[in-house]
Structures are given as C-alpha cells and as structure tokens.
Amino acid sequence: MLYSRTLFFSTIALAGVAFGAGPAPAAPASPEWAAHAVWYQIFPERFRNGDPSNDPTHDSLEEPAYVPKDWRISNWTADWYARDAWEKEQDGHEAPDVTPDFYKHGVFDRRYGGDLQGVLDKLDYLQSLGVNAIYFNPIFYARSLHKYDGSSLQHIDPYMGPDPKGDLALIAGENEDPATWHWSAADRLFLKLIAEAHRRGLHVLVDGVFNHTGRDFFAFRDLKENQQASRYKDWYVVTSWLNPADPSSKFTYKGWWGHDTLPVFAATADKNDLAPGPRQYVWDVTKRWLAPVVDGQPAQGIDGWRLDAADERPAKFWTAWNAYVRTLNPNAYTCGETWKPAAQFVEADGFSACMNYFAFAFPVKGFLIDGRIPASRFASLLDSRREAFQPGVIPALQNLVDSHDTDRLASMIVNRKLATYAPDGDISYDEKNDVRNNTTYDIGKPDATARAIQRMVVLFQMTYEGAPVVYYGDEAGMWGAHDPDDRMPMVWQDLKFAPQSTDPRGKARRADDPNFDPAVFAFYKSAIALRNSHPVLATGAVRFLNANDKEGTLSMLRFGADEDMVVAINRSTKPRVIRISDPLLNWTKPEVLMSSGAKLPALSKSGSGWELRLPALTVVVCRGAVSASPVAAAQPLGSTAAH
C-alpha cells in the first residue's frame, strides 16, 4: 500500500472526529450488512396482486360514503390516465362530474389489490435482479392506499392477507395492551414472507409511522366518541372539545401538516418526548415486529425500520427508541426520513442512517439529471455533505434518487429542462413535478437521450459510497410524475399493458407503450452485479479527480486496501477525452469493467496516467488490478434486445 494512500485514509478519519463544534458524538454502529445493501423499495398496493380473493372492498375505502356504489377494483393493465365509469361520477364528493378531472378524487380511491402474496410470488424476481434488501412502504392496517394513516400498527392490513373478514373480527376488540393482541392471518403471512426473504439473503425493512395515525386508529376512535372522558385523551393534541351544552362547539385537533385525516400523537409537556401512552404503544409494536413470539415460539422478525417524518419527533424519544431497538436486535437498521441536512439529526437521535435526499439525491439531480450545476460543484456538494456524517454511517446511507414522494427517475430526466433553481444555487426537488402544479410537465415515455442519462445515474448510484435504493419499477422501465402518477401498478413480463394514450389535461398525445422493458432490466441487473462483485464500491474511500467544468467531465476514485476503481463521467452532449491521473492511483493492468453506453471504450496509457475516450452522456467504470472477469456490457436502455 502506498504511504500517500495511508495518509489519505488517516485524514478522512481525523476529519470525521473533528467535524463541527467540539468533539463529535460517537455514531451508532450501523450493522455491517447495511453497508453492502442494495435496497428495493416496494409500494405494496401497486406491486403485485397475488391473491384476488382478498381484494379491498367498497366499505374498506378511506371515505366510502363519498365513493360511488359502482366502485370496483381497478384494472391492473389499463391505461393509467383512462378513468373508469365510477371515477367519472365522482367530483367534489356528491356533485355530478361536469368537468372531468383526473386528479379530483377518483384516482386516490383506486385500489389494484397488491398484497403480500404478490410479494412472495416475486421474491425470486428480486433475487434475480440482485438486490438484497427490501424497504416496504407501510403495510400495517389502514384505510388509505398509502397506509400512512394507520388504524393499527400491531397488525398487517387484513386486505393484504388471505382472510380479511376473519382478521377484522379477530382484532376488533384489541386495545393498546399487547395481552389483547392476536396474530392474524395477514400477520402470519408476513412472518412467512420475512422467513422466505431471509432464505434468499434479503433483509426486510418496514415503514414505521410513529408521528401520527389515522382516524380509525383505536385510540382516536375512542377519543372522538368519549371526548374528555376517553382514556386516550392525552394521546393526541386536542384543541377544542365537543360541549353538549353548546351546539356550536367542535371537536378539533392537530393534524400532520394540517391534514385532519392524520391526527398527531401528543408530546410530553416539555416537548422532549412522546406522551407516555403512545410512547409505550410504539415500544410494544417495535418489539412485536423485531422479536416476534408466535404461539409461544420465537419467529424471524424484521431487520429494521424506516421512520416516517422522523425529524418531527423529539430527539430524546428517538435516542431512547434506537437504544431499545438494539436491545432487541443489535444488527437492526434504523433509517430516519428527512429531506434536510441530516448528519446531526442521525447522530443525535441514534439512527443507523437516513434517506439520503440532501447529500446524494439533490446533487445527483443538479448535475447528472438536470445538467444545471458544474462538475466541480457536484463533487464539492457530494464531498461536503457526505463528510458531515460520521464515517461509520456513510456506507449505510440510503442513496435514493426517487421514491413514492417524488416523480420517477425517468420522468425527472424527461422534464429536466423544467427544473427551477433558487438564486443561491439550491437544487429544486419535489416541487411542481406533476401535471396538477405544472401544466407543461411531460408525462410521456423517455426517449433514447433520457434513457442514456438514466443509465448514467444508475451506474453512478451503484458505484458511489452509500447503499443504493431502487424504487419499484424503475428497473422495468416505468416512468411517472409525482404522486399519484409515481404509484402506477408495477409492470410485469407476464402482463400485457394497454398503451398510455390518454392525457389527464384533455390534450392529444402519442400512445406510449408502458410494458416491461427487458433492456432496462438488463442494465440495472448488470450495474447491481458490478456493485455486489466489488466490495470496494461498498466500503472503499472516495476521492474526486479531474473535474472539468468547461467539458462537463469528472472522475471518481474508489479505493481500498485491495482494489482501486475509477468512475469516469461525461455529462456533456459531446464525446470527451478524460485523463485519469492521481498519486493515490496504484494501477497495474487496468481494464474497463462497464459502461453506461453501448460499448466499452478503450483505455490507453498517457504519460503517468491513463486516457479514456467517452461518448456523450456516458459513465464508465475501470479498475486497476485484474482479479476476476469483468461484468459484461449491458444492452442500452430502451433497446429491443431480449432479456
């Protein structure tokens, strides 16, 4: 090992200790497996309908009184923007639909019947893709399609299991006391899913919504019915009570971001913790799913939690909760959701990591997707925001680009010229990225250029430090604007989808084929295989080289004790020559492992370094020591090559 390399590693370690004012707190140990994770995010209602017998019913909807009686399960393979008859009847609850609006209410009352059996049926698909960790959006009992409005956190949604009617009867009399809780058919099927996932080497993360509930949550139902006499009166933030002596009185309460469908759990008087009632309930739910005991026997539990709206709960609560989690499972992974600078939040609250919007997704959008910030700024943003975290946290950060809360990656790219940037250079993300807020938003299928940029993003994501996240369907070629269009039914090889030929704005549009794209899948699979085959991509250090703002090029060195890899990027729309040279680079017999383009470019010696001739909009991965056969170049995204 070169002395200069040792010095560089030492500098990184010292920087991690010295960052910020005063000594940095010791970071919670992220489990080793999290550094090697390739995450796959599943939005359960839209992933796969494996058991049509458990499909949701009209009465199971969020507000069935406002939904026409001829409501029915939506056709999985239909044109997403084509409205069913019952949707056209629904406008502003009870008024007839005189001006059809796709985004009024109907689309949010659609149900497609995605369930746990559908996930079980597709575990082999996930394994073949190469991912090794699943992140589930909420799967607990709730009325909405997104299920962030929990009716119960101790039970899987009955309509995701094999016996909805039986489960609903079984759990009807339960309260916050775990002694009253049963293991429903849906619960047991989820435990089976966990065991089957583990058998395939897949870890399981579930969405924990500990900030708010739905109005059907047992405690809130009792509160609404019994008012100040309710045993749960201290569980929520009530702002006014009903007064039998005053007909004008109203029952009001704090809802998450003002939404009355999402009543917020109360905090302690000093605002430093969750109120005792909901706090204990969260503790009990946490234990139930991390360390389940079924019929007197221990069962395999989940491997961790993704925490919704985590930065809206007090640090004291999360610190204690994270410590409790690790008493149940020292290898559990806890990931807080935040869109803000997150290093202090992660460390102070004791999380393993966070959803890495600020330190990864934002810079990636600014440079690779939108092409609006220079290469040097891209590198400096990634460096400064990454290095704000403790070194032990960085490899476990969830490096996502899109999610259920954004437009899809492919559509971000299609609409890259619509992106807005603040005067201070801040990168827009999750703003006006849909038809409702931006009538010029393009809902069409990505063209060849957009797919080329998608390949760049994916290959960089798979080679950068931190655990990459694939949002369901991206690997199959799916596109879509912000919610609800980012939650279309998953396209599968065995299903034939109708063309997307309807425009929600009533405009004429071309007919786009949304069916499973084998070339897109092949590229994702190759990029994931590259990451899984080279541990340096998961745990090696990062150093950016040769940023050229004029040419739109940049290189990144990933290095460890046994292997060096260089990722060369050409974001420009013209071919470029990139020279790779650095004192830390200790290459012998270098080779090109993978390209986001159609062919592997030649690597040639140039003085003390190496030269690559990169086509436009291309990322290439090289390494120095030949110890295994290179990953084969995948077909370009969007090609017609068979999978």
Describe the predicted segments one by one.
Residues 34, 49-104, 379-587:
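Loop/helix patches that line or flank the sugar-binding groove of alpha-linked glycan CAZymes
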Residues 25-202, 280, 287, 617, ...:
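N-terminal structural segment of carbohydrate-active enzymes
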Residues 44-46, 134-146, 208-217, 308-313, ...:
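Short, solvent-exposed turn/loop segments enriched in Gly/Ser/Thr/Pro and often Arg
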Residues 194-202, 211-212, 220-227, 285, ...:
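Active-site-proximal helices and loops of the catalytic beta/alpha 8
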Residues 31, 35, 51-73, 142-162, ...:
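Aromatic- and acidic-residue-enriched segments that line the glycan-binding/catalytic groove
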Residues 38-39, 603-641:
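C-terminal beta-strand-rich structural cap/linker in extracellular carbohydrate-active enzymes
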Residues 42, 126, 136, 153, ...:
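Conserved, mostly hydrophobic/aromatic
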Residues 224-288, 292-293, 310:
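Active-site-adjacent "subsite" loops/lids of carbohydrate-active enzymes
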